[in-house]
Amino acid sequence: MKNDKKRMLLAGVLALSVLTGCSSASAASATSSMAASMAAASPAASSEVVSQPETAEGVVLPIAQGSLEEIKTGSYQFAANITSVDAKKRQMDMTVYAYDSYRTEDIDGLEAGEAIRIHPDGAVEAQDLTVESIERNEETDIVSINGGIEQGGVDLWRSNDVYRTVTYDDYPVYYMVGELVLPMDENITLSDSSSGVDAASVETNGTNSVASAVGADLDSWTEYNTTVSTTDGKVSNILRIWVP
């Protein structure tokens, strides 16, 4: 990553798409993480995720992700590419994405000779990368492993007390978790400020209105600008932001 790029604030990216949990009381918030809860109202088709061990000796692991099965019954927040919407069936087809993030203490203590588990270049399966060199830039809060992305390595940026992957365009390095068909909550809400960098958010409520708004612009709901929130396995909120 070029020095001038490293000095830029990493703005305009989605709020945490990592599938981590918290209380169901905050499930309606587009910027809060959510925890698993009760069963979904209807079954959802999915592709399976390869599970990974939560511990590995000598390897720094990313913060644990929720699985597709958990999303189908729980309350979560994640980046998604919405591919279709059916107002009559009150359901949406989408591809779920995540990115690797790490506890601050794990990255601060990482040294050459150790390893870090990561999804390189957005690969579906994670790999263990041996750390040959590590450079910490306190001014930019960026940690470059094996020369950073400019030299085929990895750059991690510290945000919200965690480190996450970052690309040249300041986005996280998204990888595909799998595909889901999820029902829409009858009180679903949509907040859309994607029309411009300073655009006011357009608020839409209810299954029919939200389905119509999403369906009218179906090719423009991607992992880079769209965050989906679920409550008890139903889509309860969609947030779309402007991206350059």
Each PLM stretch: what is its role?
Residues 49-244:
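Solvent-exposed hydroxyl-ligand-binding patches built from regularly spaced Ser/Thr
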Residues 2-10:
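Bacterial N-terminal signal peptides that target proteins for export
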Residues 9, 22-34, 38-43:
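Bacterial lipoprotein signal-peptidase II cleavage site
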